């Protein structure tokens, strides 16, 4: 499925030094998708940065035939956001 990144999200992604390729990976091959606020979904993938486990969370909405990225951020609080099956 195609995706679009809204301008504010792209600005935040760049400010946070998150590679666009990581955002694409999270959307196309998420390790987990969880429910977010207001019907949004959050695609999640774990990355290792400087030996530290980090969780990339990409918040998106599905509109017609594409995913629209609202924001994305990295967090070290993997256990807080990761949902156990």
For each feature predicted by the language model, list its residue ranges.
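Ribonuclease/tRNase effector modules and their secretory precursors
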Residues: 1-85
């Amino acid at each position: 499925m195609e995706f679009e990144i809204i301008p504010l999200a792209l600005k935040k992604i760049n400010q946070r030094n998150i590679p666009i390729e990581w955002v694409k990976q999270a959307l196309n091959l998420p390790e987990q998708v969880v429910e977010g606020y207001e019907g949004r979904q959050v695609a999640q993938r774990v990355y290792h940065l400087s030996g530290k486990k980090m969780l990339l969370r990409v918040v998106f909405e599905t509109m017609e035939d594409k995913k629209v990225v609202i924001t994305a951020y990295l967090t070290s609080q993997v256990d807080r956001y990761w949902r156990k099956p």
